[in-house]
A protein has these predicted regions:
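General nucleic-acid-binding
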Residues: 72-120
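Acidic-enriched, low-complexity/disordered segments with a strong bias for Aspartate over Glutamate
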Residues: 11, 37, 59, 76, ...
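A short, Lys/Arg-enriched amphipathic alpha-helix from helix-turn-helix/homeodomain DNA-binding modules
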Residues: 102-106, 111, 115-147
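N-terminal regulatory/effector-sensing and dimerization cores
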Residues: 2-92
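Intrinsically disordered, low-complexity regions
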Residues: 33, 40-41, 64, 92-95, ...
Length: 147
């Protein structure tokens, strides 16, 4: 098994760890979860689903059950990436499973990440694979930035 890690890249935390049965919880953050070795079971909003990847919106009750390590992308609700996930991946749903082949590719991409530079490259590739790169470059309101 790979060593656990946590990397902050831009406004996301990328966490690889193995938590076999965490308690169901909810918080003010969205998640993307990817299998690193084999599919996991997610319990989301009372529904059990087996997946290689899942997007979970903010304030949605959830837990992921897996003996194998997973990659969890923790995304604060107030960030541009959270808006991208809502618009591109969730599309109005509280959660949505992600394409298996894309999810497997993301898990594979992160398998050998060990440094900040590796993490930055893997995060950019993850955004590209999920179609989040273009959406993320939305213009900020300059009036807010000046305040």
């Amino acid at each position: 098994m790979n060593e656990p890690f946590i990397f902050r890249v831009s406004d996301c935390y990328y966490i690889q760890a193995s938590y076999p049965s965490p308690a169901e919880h909810r918080h003010f953050a969205a998640h993307l979860v990817f299998a690193m070795e084999r599919p996991f079971t997610a319990l989301v909003n009372g529904v059990s689903v087996e997946a290689a990847g899942i997007a979970i919106g903010s304030d949605v009750p959830h837990t992921v059950l897996s003996e194998a390590p997973t990659l969890v992308v923790f995304i604060d609700e107030l960030t541009p990436m959270s808006r991208c996930v809502k618009h591109t991946l969730l599309r109005g749903a509280p959660w949505r499973t992600l394409d298996t082949s894309v999810s497997s590719e993301v898990g594979e991409r992160w398998r050998d990440v060990r440094t900040e530079a590796d993490a930055a490259a893997a995060a950019a590739e993850t955004e590209r694979l999920l179609g989040l790169q273009e959406q993320r470059t939305s213009a900020e309101d300059p009036r807010i930035l000046e305040a």
